[in-house]
Amino acid sequence: MKKGLFIFTIDALVLTGCSSNEGFSGPRDSVADNVKNRFGVTFDPNHDWCTTTSGTVTISGIPAGATNVQLYALISKEVKNDDNETEAETSLLKLNEATNVGSSVNLVYDAPKDHQAIYAAADVNGYRMMRLVKNGVADFSGTKSAAARRRAAVAPDYSSMKLFADSTFESFASQRGWFGEKKQYLYGMSGEAYQKWVQKAEPYSAEYTQLFRDLVFSYFQNKVRNLEKIMESKLVNDKVYPLTTGDAPIVVSPVYKRDQATRWGNEVWNSDLYYYYYKEETLTDYVTKGGNAVDFLNALPKYKAIPFNQHFGSTEDDKIEKRASYTLIYWGDGEPDYNTPGQAFPAGYKIGFMVRAKTTSEAPRKQGELYGDGRLNNKINFWPNFKTSNLGTDGPRACWLNVEDRLFLTFESGTDDDFNDIILEVEGGIDPISFVPEFDRDFYTFCFEDRELGDYDMNDVVIRATRINETTVEYSIVACGAYDQLQVRNVNGATIKDDAEIHALFGVSTNTFINTVKGATSLDPVTDQVTVSKDFSFLNAATQPYIHNVTMGKDIKLSQKGEDPHGIMIPYAFRWPKEKTCIKDAYLRFNEWGQNSRINSTDWYKYPVEENVY
């Protein structure tokens, strides 16, 4: 998903000193006095002002057919949850990428110092396999494919499974008259039958469990409205239905729920998973004869697959575990027969899923049928409690997602639109579905003060940089809060040349502040891509961009150990201070970091003061 230039994302900017016609090239004691007056503290004399680390990863055992290989950094930020408790919000950032690789490759990376982990990834046959980097090494050897797991699956005995009349209910939608005179019924087996039907599942390894958490919740972040990402997958509405193959059981395993059970009335624990199915040609024939597809789908029998209160603990929350599986049963077409045992699914059926929310808290405001196919949610999405999700007409309640070659269905069962309330693994006899989540590249921001006696708003020149792949780096000049004539050197691009004056590149005069004054006209960045060596690093001083102040005849480079912070390279989507605002007032933890970079507020740049940043 594309991010706006000045929205807080995980990228990096280069901050430079404030620009104005004040200041001069004075002696170092004058500079030191100015720094102390501006910041009000004494900085660590051994501070190197570095927020970044670098390394090389050896990736081996790359599967045949891999189209590219990437490196990702896992980063986190502290946020407050609904109970005002601190928890970590994670993100994955792409660091480097290589194509046309063989069975092994070495990739160089730069990453924020405070990263939690580095992952190597290989794209193979529409899936993204990932390995945690340990001691600079990632090995893909010995990967067990979904096909191998599928061959190992054992078909259950369907012959004793029958529908139970006392487990037939009129849907909430039908009770509310949403289908007019028509009635909609939900069918299921007895509670005892489900207890017999459940099978013990092979648990995930500790490493896969960690990968699941890191990937899923970096993409579907908690309490973040993720509908846009759902729609980008294109696996919504009529595309949300997997197609049965008839050659293996279809197995569904609940692996996660998060509903703050004790606070909100055990929402998931009180709910059930249902499914329904049809043949595409039957639906097509119905529509061809003048029928409506939504009416057809609503009229299909809905069968209970999993009573969540038999699987999850009543207060279980935010726990990833695959411990039990339920095989979907084919009950025939048309009106259900209570006396006919179930069968394995034949080929050629499309399967849809629905969660029947029936929490006892605030009922019936929080009760209703929630469909993966958004076309069936045009009433429930406007029902008293559910309407606060803002999913609107046709808003889906579920999305497919791959973690490696395993397939998961992620449900939004409540109102916060984060699509991580219930997560189910679906495997076996269905055609492959591929949706690999994409993550933003890591960015670095170079921020410079253009004069020695600066105001340290660190926006005199701001450069955003990102590594596109092994041999390509992109630089963008995104802001210039200075009146001096300035040049960006050491980029050596087609546009950002050593002798190119920054204001001229934006087509404005030198008495113009560029993207540093709130409410002023925003100008598009000036961007260049340059070719670099495979061992390139943003930490290499020989290849780092720096500023030449033509007016003062001075070069401004990134700050070194013991110097004042006149040039800093910052990771993530850093938002630079607005004009004439010292960085300590835009980021209240900056001074703590400046006094002891090894201990204090090493992630200060994640917490801006909104009114003081651009």
Where are these regions (language model features)?
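Sec-dependent N-terminal signal peptides
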Residues: G4-L13
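Extracellular distal adhesion/interaction modules in secreted or cell-surface proteins
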Residues: N21-Y614
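C-terminal motif of bacterial Sec signal peptides marking the signal peptidase cleavage site
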Residues: L15-G17
